[in-house]
Amino acid sequence: MAEVSAQMVKELRERTNAGMMDCKKALAESGGDFAKAEEWLRKKGIAKAAGKEGRVASEGIIGTYVHSGRIGVIVEVNCETDFVARNPDFQELVKDVAMQIAAAGPKFVRREEVPTDNLDKEKDIQREILKQQGKPEAMLEKILVGKMEKYYEGVCLVDQLWVKDDKKKVGEMISERAAKIGEKVSVRRFVRYELGEGIEKKKDDLAAEVAKTLGQA
């Protein structure tokens, strides 16, 4: 049987919520392979099905991305263990998220973070536009639902189309990567800087430039 370290047992316990001794035995029986150990625990009915749901993603890394010295992003992406935080797949995910923020310029991570005042203002604007277009009063609220979805796609990171594959949203991409990694993954917060932001100057579409670069990657 393979030698099983205390750290390995700790990592498997955090993944499965199974007991320490069960985790140790699973790793020993699986030759130290985490995927096989998890499968062993599931077959024995030891791994807790609800374990992942109740766990907190409190580890992770701070990722950064700078495009041509003109757009900079700092983003915090969380996972459940420091073991995964060191995983190349997780670090690649963080890089992709940072580049998405640079290219698409979201204002919030998810729609629950959008202030009510912002939503009310956007609804008023869209409602007035629809009225000027002669849309029937009875249809306004229904049309507004679609308009607000478009608004969320513009300002919320997880609702945006992924710049590397516009057939899926960023939230879907993150969920797919999280499933592959085997842990809960969550974007907590980010900051995006653009050179000269707030200063009146010649219009340069830096976001489009970043998106073009990503498309060539």
Swiss-Prot record:
One of its GO terms (cellular component) is cytoplasm. This is Elongation factor Ts. The keyword Hydrolase does not apply. It is found in: Cytoplasm. Keywords: Cytoplasm, Elongation factor, Protein biosynthesis. Belongs to the EF-Ts family. Residues 81-84 are annotated as: Involved in Mg(2+) ion dislocation from EF-Tu. It holds the Pfam family EF_TS. InterPro entries: EF-Ts_dimer_sf, Transl_elong_EFTs/EF1B, Transl_elong_EFTs/EF1B_dimer, Transl_elong_Ts_CS, UBA-like_sf.
